[in-house]
């Protein structure tokens, strides 16, 4: 029997490429599901009523550092909630952020501490919380004015005292 070594060497390589392609396809298919899992509802209770938002949650250092950078748009009713547990002085900026935002600084009890409205895109100017904040909600600029959101209003989300 004649034994061809080139064929036997190619079989493991072919299997490796098939496995790598399958793993890549699996990761690509699972990516939207992983991103969708980080989106949660958030309520803001104002004098005008309750406004419900769908927010991405930024908890890791990488997520907090990147935030909404490089995004070209943010729909009304969408946003990103940054978890800065435990409550602390927080500073934000707009570096590499193409869209103007309203930044809502939130205390540990869920009350709004301060709102920085209509932030300047791409700016490296520091935007401080001016007090202790456990979270920051970023929404498209004009949202606070549109819905009458003001300091003292309440946020309903599990990050704030489990509510």
Question: Model regions: which residues?
Answer:
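Bacterial N-terminal signal peptides that target proteins for export
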Residues: 3-21
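Compact, glycine-rich, soluble single-domain proteins
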Residues: 36-163
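Long, non-catalytic terminal segments
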Residues: 5, 32-36
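Bacterial N-terminal signal peptides
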Residues: 17-32
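Short linear sequence elements within intrinsically disordered, low-complexity coil regions
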Residues: 8, 31, 87-89
């Amino acid at each position: 029997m004649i034994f061809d070594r080139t064929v036997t060497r190619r079989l493991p390589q072919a299997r490796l490429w098939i496995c790598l392609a399958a793993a890549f396809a699996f990761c690509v298919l699972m990516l939207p599901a992983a991103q969708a899992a980080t989106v949660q509802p958030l309520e803001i209770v104002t004098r005008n009523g309750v406004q419900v938002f769908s927010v991405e949650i930024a908890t890791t250092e990488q997520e907090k550092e990147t935030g909404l950078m490089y995004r070209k748009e943010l729909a009304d009713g969408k946003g990103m909630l940054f978890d800065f547990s435990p409550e602390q002085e927080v500073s934000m900026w707009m570096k590499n952020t193409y869209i103007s935002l309203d930044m809502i600084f939130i205390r540990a009890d869920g009350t709004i501490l301060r709102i920085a409205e209509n932030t300047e895109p791409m700016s490296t100017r520091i935007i401080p919380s001016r007090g202790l904040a456990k979270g920051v909600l970023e929404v498209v600029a004009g949202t606070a004015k549109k819905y009458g959101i003001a300091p003292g209003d309440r946020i309903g989300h599990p990050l704030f005292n489990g509510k």
